[in-house]
């Protein structure tokens, strides 16, 4: 019978907020889908949690050009941020992000940071879809390069690209 490391509901919510900030990487202290399922957490409580996490040195604030609200990241991730900012040998890579990837939890933040609007259209009736049934955002380096609709054909082990939509053709390099 070990004691509960989180003595009350507030401590539990605080722990979950810190975990969410770590999962997404960068969040703001405002209403967000990133806070879903942190039961009964009201705005005033969230604001208090952020104040405490800041005063305890568990999160750090950062200002991003073009965004009025401060954003926050975990203090334990600061060395990683410094490494990324100092990396002169950076080579961008391409990632297809799953619709429920934690990076995409706050769609409004993604729009503010990247100018990229994403909606998972799996439950949208076909005639109302803008893109497709199961479209994945394409992250290339530090930008959203587009969207891809692909299907894995299990029998042939082939990835069939049904459609691709580019956000900015200047990102495309053909060798």
Q: Which stretches of residues belong to each language-model region?
A:
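Long, charged, low-complexity, helical-prone intrinsically disordered regions
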Residues: 1-171, 175
């Amino acid at each position: 019978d070990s004691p509960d490391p989180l003595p009350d509901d507030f401590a539990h919510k605080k722990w979950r907020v810190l975990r969410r900030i770590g999962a997404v990487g960068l969040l703001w202290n405002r209403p967000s889908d990133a806070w879903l399922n942190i039961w009964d957490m009201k705005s005033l409580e969230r604001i208090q949690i952020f104040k405490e996490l800041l005063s305890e040195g568990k999160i750090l604030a950062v200002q991003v050009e073009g965004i009025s609200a401060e954003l926050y990241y975990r203090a334990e991730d600061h060395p990683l941020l410094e490494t990324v900012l100092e990396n002169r040998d950076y080579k961008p890579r391409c990632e297809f992000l799953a619709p429920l990837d934690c990076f995409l939890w706050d769609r409004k933040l993604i729009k503010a940071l990247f100018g990229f609007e994403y909606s998972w259209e799996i439950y949208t009736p076909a005639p109302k879809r803008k893109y497709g049934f199961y479209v994945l955002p394409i992250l290339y380096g530090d930008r959203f390069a587009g969207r891809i609709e692909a299907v894995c054909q299990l029998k042939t082990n082939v990835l069939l690209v049904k459609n691709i939509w580019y956000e900015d053709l200047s990102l495309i390099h053909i060798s």
